[in-house]
């Protein structure tokens, strides 16, 4: 859980209360508009947990693959140990799609054949909803493996993903679409179960169980924490509001809100005007989301990568050890 901030603080003042993970929480999902600092917050969270001896996987769902740049290390399609207790992973969607298609070839052959549609494996990755299904499957495997204490999800920008909940004007990211995808897939699976043999039925049931497992993980605040990152500007604030409302309408609780790139000291008139505008948006967010943990991060004034992540981790979570419950 992120530290709570009740007022805008000068950059030099540290917030003392450390992060609190309650019970067996395993998944920290970081969401928000593109360009607000999700990847930096994801990476800094991984730094903080791994520094406390917790095996952590930072898992990028962003096609831009910013984690490589932020950690200043080349990452690939397999988890890579980048420092003690911290692994990072940037899966290649095309490669994962080929593997996923091979894994469930019988299901997809039956499904596409039912509608007399021929789909080549190389075209599979571009189909709506496939990337979410692949990530769901991959996350399920990670949870079953139980190798890591925490999995940090650096999500794709909400405006870059195709919603599966009939919400064309609101893109809500992986969490919401997994929940909606479940209902669509159950209808298709029920249809397939009437016309195919035991081997396909078993594969269908396996996929259904995985969808149910990840749904239960996302709905349980003891196993998942959703953090929304935003900046104090109109477009970002409005998209964050829609994201939170849509996700929570499906039973997934957003526990924390990070307000990034906040100007805290300025001399020029332009900066003072911008700071006044930011203050207005910050106060609105604090008023609207009083029940959530709200953290304010300063504008660091330079690119955050490598060793600078330690400062962000401290600003997010403090210097202390993890609280116990």
Task: Name the predicted role of every residue range.
Residues 144, 166, 179, 212-215, ...:
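Signal for well-folded cores of large energy- and translation-related assemblies
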Residues 200-214, 236:
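C-terminal-of-GTPase-core extension/linker across diverse P-loop GTPases
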Residues 135, 167, 181, 210, ...:
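Alpha-helical structural motif
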Residues 11, 45, 49, 56, ...:
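Residue-identity detector for threonine
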Residues 108-112, 116, 209, 213-216, ...:
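N-proximal short alpha-helices
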Residues 133-137, 141, 209-212, 238, ...:
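Short, contiguous clusters of charged residues that form electrostatic/catalytic patches at enzyme active sites
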Residues 16-36, 40-165, 169-205:
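Nucleotide-state-sensitive switch-loop elements of NTP-binding domains
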Residues 2-22, 215-325:
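C-terminal lobe/tail of nucleotide-utilizing enzymes
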